[in-house]
């Protein structure tokens, strides 16, 4: 065992546990703070908050490409035109159908309700008086339910060229007309997906068409039917159809700094919300709300100089003007760039339109200090750092946007007892910390002072928040997670303090954090709120709450998550036929075919590694945290490496020839040959690695490249593979630059193979070096696979999404490449493969198999001529390929549609599947 110097941020885990225990065991009066203050950053291994790979990095490049729709549609059509290998073999969706968090497993104490994949969009059918007919959009497709989420019919499969749904709407003038906007654009690396435009159905979703005259843009953020047409807000501006979806045309908005003409920047017309005044349904208001606001782009110009509100009183193209009242969407706690992502909603007051706005602060995302910083910290207690909060505030206008009244700020939104974000501000997080990612608002159609909005949690009014001045009062009705249960979770995993009986004091389980959509349906007895978040969809019918007011509570939410919509980064089939999963924002777990996933670990699941023992497997979370279970998930043990500067998805792999041999990498490469006997000792107070059996084999250190500001860029691992003693580490420099940094990224491999006169050894520094990597393009490597017949031959797949602002001819369009000299030189095998993201690669019986954003493809070792593998896959991104120990079952991670399996019915010699970054 090697004793390690302390590298990570020091914080007393015991203080976290003590605070959790105090918050959990001390009932608090209504309106009081939920927990005592805790000093310091979040403990390195406390994976209870999903960071979404941080917003302050380069988002996918094709967001900025106005031809994204054309590109993605072209990729899909090219994929569909390729011949099919194994045409008689169909892919099978094996599940999981939702996810449970039972108390008998380590994370059960967190008390999450049954969940699924991210809920991104929703619309109710106004013709159904029961409120039960609802359309929901996820990362993996569109579904309709006529029984409030008990059962579903999937829509659009076979027609949607990309199935991630950013918005859905029904036209009340033509109720059978359904509009589905593909593409989700939150400006995160894990939560975004490019689309192929808007699809239209005229029969309630039974059949669909894609108008040739369509939108251009990465994602669809809003679809709003009006009396004059259906407006679509996208990442590339505003569009409208006036012929029931037969065609769409661009609507000009005066988004330059003077508001006299459209701004020309790639991000300058990012429409985050579109609403129509409810009485006549003609006056249309649009929020241009790029989360980054006026941050300078690679060309030195503001990304979005005209964030704010725009209106056409007649709902017509060519009639939109800047709404001067936008300047009122600020307050002393906001920065000088106060308008970022904005959500709008109208109330239905009988005598005048009431407009609400939930506004993210672009300046805070760009790490500016609030304009009134002299009072911050003395009157509000608000953190000035970029992780404290990103929320500007909640506003109400009683004159249709001419003036605004501030109704809530991050400081005024107080947590409730046993609610997870109650102690986060002291750890560097605050309410609204992800307002660029979590941001929606809805108004009670019976009372325009009763408002509901989603950030990390869902809030509702608890007192009249009408036209009178002063801040309103709000309470949380969907909590982040259960503080009392988190204490027990820490006790289970990290020797914390167990929580006593909690239900009598704190009520029912949490649904899930990170709220994306909320819609209201009328019911015979009141209203129903449908919400979508990173854990799926939930519903609740209104009932008397505070002082008889009709609303919602934390305890009676009903899940709607009996569908296969989880978003796996990694999957593996165990010898007993069960599957283990690593899921976006839903941890790691296991399930049987056709069953429900059982949650075992928390955070973002990143890697899942199966062994020959069906009761022993490994699960990892963001930041290279690694656990092992040896009793089928009932208990887990921490055995993480002590990597230098681990990334969100730093790779961890297992040697297919020796499952005791594990390799992990970030800036450095570490190995262990002890498998389940590997131990890692953590400081009980600081939660840092003080001793471990992991040995450092190689530290790539500084690259020869610099950022635009002149800082030396460090190498960091993007992907790994191992076979015997041979290890390849795909490295990247400048892969995660800030948005305004125009520097090209660089990539290569380091390895212990190919050094003259040197024989590689497991867990040894011998022979390690950085290969030349000649021929590699300026894009990130996503996966590595060693040829099982020749360890000097290595295959890589590459990512499309890099280098914003650069011509693709400069960065390179290669997606699959091979080196036959241990990484010194690479040649292109892409051939006729669609040039979307290629995410994973393996070999089976001498055939290459590649996972891409357009499906699974195969070709001979020499590449070039690719075919589709099998039939029946949905149009979603495939993140991972995994062969079971026999080589008979190929299992894939279909992002947004769960786990799929192809049964070859024969054994095979294989390579390891490699391990990339998952995105």
Ranges and model annotations:
Residues 22-39, 916-919:
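C-terminal region of N-terminal signal peptides and the immediate post-cleavage residues
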Residues 905-918:
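Low-complexity, Pro/Thr/Ser/Gly/Ala-rich linker/spacer regions in secreted
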Residues 36-908:
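Beta-propeller blade termini and top-face loops
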Residues 14-24:
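Bacterial N-terminal signal peptides
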Residues 9-13, 27, 401:
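Intrinsically disordered, low-complexity segments enriched in polar/charged small residues
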Residues 2-16:
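N-terminal export and membrane-targeting signals
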């Amino acid at each position: 065992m090697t004793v390690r110097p302390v590298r990570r941020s020091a914080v007393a885990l015991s203080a976290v546990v003590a605070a959790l225990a105090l918050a959990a065991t001390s009932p608090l009066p209504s309106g009081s703070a939920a927990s005592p203050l805790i000093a310091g950053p979040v403990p390195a291994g406390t994976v209870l908050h999903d960071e979404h790979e941080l917003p302050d990095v380069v988002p996918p490049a094709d967001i900025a490409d106005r031809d994204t729709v054309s590109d993605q549609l072209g990729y899909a059509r090219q994929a569909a035109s390729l011949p099919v290998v194994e045409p008689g073999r169909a892919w099978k969706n094996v599940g999981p159908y939702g996810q449970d968090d039972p108390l008998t497993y380590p994370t059960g104490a967190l008390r999450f309700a049954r969940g699924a994949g991210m809920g991104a969009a929703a619309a109710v059918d106004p013709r159904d008086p029961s409120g039960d007919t609802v359309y929901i959009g996820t990362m993996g497709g569109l579904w309709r339910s006529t029984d409030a989420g008990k059962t579903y019919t999937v829509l659009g499969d076979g027609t949607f060229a990309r199935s991630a749904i950013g918005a859905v709407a029904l036209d009340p003038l033509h109720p059978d007309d359904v509009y589905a906007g593909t593409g989700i654009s939150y400006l995160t690396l894990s939560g975004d997906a490019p689309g192929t435009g808007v699809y239209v159905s005229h029969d309630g979703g039974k059949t669909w068409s894609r108008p040739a005259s369509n939108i251009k843009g990465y994602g669809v953020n809003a679809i709003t039917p009006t009396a004059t047409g259906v407006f679509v807000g996208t990442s590339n501006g505003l569009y409208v159809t006036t012929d029931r979806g037969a065609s769409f045309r661009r609507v000009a908005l005066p988004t330059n700094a003077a508001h006299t003409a459209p701004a020309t920047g790639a991000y300058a017309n990012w429409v985050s919300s579109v609403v129509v005044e409810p009485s006549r349904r003609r006056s249309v208001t649009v929020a241009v709300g790029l989360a980054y606001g006026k941050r300078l782009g690679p060309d030195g110009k503001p990304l979005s100089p005209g964030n704010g509100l725009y209106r056409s009183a007649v709902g017509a193209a060519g009639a939109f003007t800047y709404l001067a009242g936008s300047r009122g969407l600020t307050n002393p706690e906001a920065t000088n760039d106060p308008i970022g992502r904005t959500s709008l909603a109208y109330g239905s007051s009988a005598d005048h339109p009431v407009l609400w706005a939930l506004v993210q602060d672009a300046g805070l995302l760009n790490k500016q200090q609030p304009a009134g910083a002299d009072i911050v910290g003395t009157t509000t207690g608000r953190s000035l750092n970029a992780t404290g909060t990103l929320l500007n505030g909640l506003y109400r206008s009683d004159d249709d946007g001419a003036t605004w009244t501030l109704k809530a700020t991050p400081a005024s939104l107080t947590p409730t007892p046993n609610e997870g974000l109650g102690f986060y501000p002291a750890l560097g997080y605050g309410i609204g910390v992800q307002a660029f990612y979590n941001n929606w608002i809805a108004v009670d159609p019976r009372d325009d002072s009763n408002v509901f909005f989603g950030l990390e949690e869902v809030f509702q009014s608890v007192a009249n928040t009408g036209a009178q001045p002063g801040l309103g009062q709000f309470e949380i009705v969907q909590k982040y997670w259960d503080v009392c249960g988190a204490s027990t979770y820490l006790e289970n995993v990290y020797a914390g303090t167990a929580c006593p009986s909690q239900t009598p004091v704190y009520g029912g389980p949490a649904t899930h954090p990170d709220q994306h959509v909320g819609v209201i349906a009328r019911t015979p007895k009141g209203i129903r709120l449908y919400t979508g978040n990173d854990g799926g969809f939930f519903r609740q019918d209104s009932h008397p709450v505070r002082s008889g007011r009709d609303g919602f509570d934390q305890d009676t939410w009903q899940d709607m998550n009996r569908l296969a919509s989880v978003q796996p980064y990694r999957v593996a089939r165990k010898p007993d036929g069960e599957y283990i999963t690593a899921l976006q924002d839903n941890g790691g777990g296991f399930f049987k075919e056709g069953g429900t996933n059982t949650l075992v670990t928390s955070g973002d699941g990143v890697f899942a590694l199966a062994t020959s023992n069906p009761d022993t497997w490994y699960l990892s979370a963001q930041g290279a945290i690694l656990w092992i279970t040896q009793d089928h998930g009932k208990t887990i043990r921490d055995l993480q490496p002590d990597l230098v500067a681990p990334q969100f998805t730093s790779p961890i792999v297992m040697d297919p020839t020796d499952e005791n041999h594990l390799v992990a990498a970030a800036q450095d490469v570490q190995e262990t040959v002890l498998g389940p006997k590997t131990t890692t000792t953590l400081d009980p107070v600081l939660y840092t690695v003080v001793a471990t059996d992991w040995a450092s084999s190689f530290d790539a250190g500084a690259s020869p490249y610099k950022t635009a500001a002149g800082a030396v860029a460090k190498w960091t691992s993007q992907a790994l593979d191992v076979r015997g003693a041979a290890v390849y580490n795909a490295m990247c420099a400048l892969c995660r630059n800030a948005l305004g940094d125009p520097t090209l990224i660089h990539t290569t491999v380091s390895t212990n193979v190919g050094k003259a006169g040197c024989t590689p050894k497991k867990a040894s520094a011998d022979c390690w070096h950085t290969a030349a990597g000649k021929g590699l393009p300026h894009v990130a490597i996503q996966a590595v696979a060693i040829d099982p017949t020749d360890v000097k031959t290595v295959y890589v797949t590459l990512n499309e999404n890099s280098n914003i602002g650069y011509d693709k001819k400069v960065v390179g369009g290669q997606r699959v490449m091979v080196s036959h000299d241990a990484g010194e030189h690479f040649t292109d095998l892409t051939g006729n493969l669609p040039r979307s993201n290629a995410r994973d690669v393996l070999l089976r019986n001498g055939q290459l198999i590649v996972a891409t954003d357009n499906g699974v493809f195969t070709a001979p070792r020499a590449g070039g001529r690719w075919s589709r593998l099998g039939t029946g896959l949905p149009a979603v991104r495939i993140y991972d390929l995994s062969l079971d120990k026999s080589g008979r079952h190929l299992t894939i991670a279909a992002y947004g549609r769960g786990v799929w399996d192809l049964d070859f019915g024969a054994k095979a010699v294989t390579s390891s599947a490699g391990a990339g970054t998952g995105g």
